[in-house]
From Swiss-Prot:
Species for this entry: Enterococcus faecalis (strain ATCC 700802 / V583)
Pathway entry: Cofactor biosynthesis; coenzyme A biosynthesis; CoA from (R)-pantothenate: step 1/5
Keyword set includes Phosphoprotein: no
Localization terms from the record: Cytoplasm
Enzyme Commission number: 2.7.1.33
Ligand binding (ATP): G90, S91, V92, A93, V94, G95, K96, S97
Protein name: Pantothenate kinase
GO BP term, example: coenzyme A biosynthetic process
Single GO MF descriptor: pantothenate kinase activity
Taxonomic path: Bacteria, Bacillati, Bacillota, Bacilli, Lactobacillales
Length: 307
């Protein structure tokens, strides 16, 4: 079954025509600071893709606030507007992090009085020590490697308006959750949640992460392209890791390059590709917006959910 049958397919040119105000919401220097390793994005992408997307998100936000007000009228009591949560899903190396950081910056710039924060679900991975104890270190990134109950409780606290919540922090250079290190989430008006598992429906859960989302985005591309980007990113990480013995990639950076890339290709084949095909791609049809990428991370097609 076509998982895009209930979407409006929109070309890049048509999408840009829906909303453009001629103003650049950020500078080239700010954009360079936002980009992930080896990701490619330009101010033209910001204007043609992300400015209209921000406008669409604002429409969803207004409807969300209106519904909250209506609930209060029905209940004959004041109901505060909970945080508006945006979920961003997609494969490893597809550019989710850049999309998330860019949206955070544009939303904060556009809605100056709104507190816009961002977390990644990587922080809710079980620590490596736990994965090793459970014998699932080779399944890191698969659904069972995440503490979903902890993530769901975190999102429930966010929606409930708790003053200050600790979000665990993951380090890609250490390749592990950093014990005792947290990011403070302090009553955001908008929270962006980025991760490969944000739209998944684990069989053992009665409440899903996506139940807390008010808008969701899936960053999509052909798996062969994603593999190419994954290997390019791996090479870029090796180029800096050899300077730091504490970096997870140091062991590969100081050895033979061909051996390191053979390892990376094997990880893609045995971990990332199966995870994409079995658990990530099947969630694509649950997103409100699909951003489809082609060569050089260029977004060529947008899919807007009909219903």
């Amino acid at each position: 079954m076509d998982d895009k049958m209930n979407y409006y397919p929109i070309s890049r040119e048509e999408w840009h025509g829906f909303y453009h105000d001629g103003k650049a919401p950020l500078t080239e220097a700010e954009l360079d600071n936002i980009k992930s390793v080896n990701d490619q994005i330009s101010l033209k992408d910001v204007q043609e893709i992300y400015v209209p997307l921000t406008h669409l998100i604002h429409l969803y936000m207004k409807e969300f606030e209106s519904l909250t007000l209506s609930k209060g009228l029905f209940l004959h009591e004041y109901v505060s507007v909970p945080p508006f949560i945006i979920g961003i899903a997609g494969s490893v190396a597809v550019g989710k992090s850049t999309t998330a950081r860019l949206l955070q910056r544009i939303l904060a710039r556009t809605f100056k009085r709104r507190n816009v924060q961002l977390i990644t679900t990587d922080g809710f991975l079980y620590p490596n020590k736990v994965l090793e104890e459970q014998g699932i270190m080779d399944r890191k990134g698969f659904p069972e490697s995440y503490d979903m109950e902890k993530l769901i409780n975190f999102l429930n606290e966010v929606k409930s308006g708790k003053d200050e919540i600790k979000a665990p922090v993951y380090s890609h250079s250490v390749y592990d959750v950093i014990e005792g290190e947290y990011e403070l989430i302090q009553q955001p008006d908008i929270l962006i949640v980025e991760g490969i598992n944000t739209l998944q429906l684990p069989a053992n859960q009665q409440i899903y992460v996506s139940d807390f989302f008010d808008f969701s985005i899936f960053v999509d591309a052909d798996p062969a392209l994603i593999e190419k980007w994954y290997l390019e990113r791996f090479g870029a990480l090796l180029d800096t890791a050899f300077l730091d013995p504490n970096n997870y990639y140091y062991q590969y950076a100081i050895g033979k390059r061909e051996d390191a890339f053979a390892m990376a290709r094997n990880v893609w084949k045995t971990v990332n590709l199966p995870n994409l095909e079995e658990y990530i791609l099947p969630t694509r049809g649950r997103a409100d917006i699909i951003l489809h990428k082609t060569e050089n991370h260029l977004i060529d097609q947008i899919y807007l959910r009909k219903y």
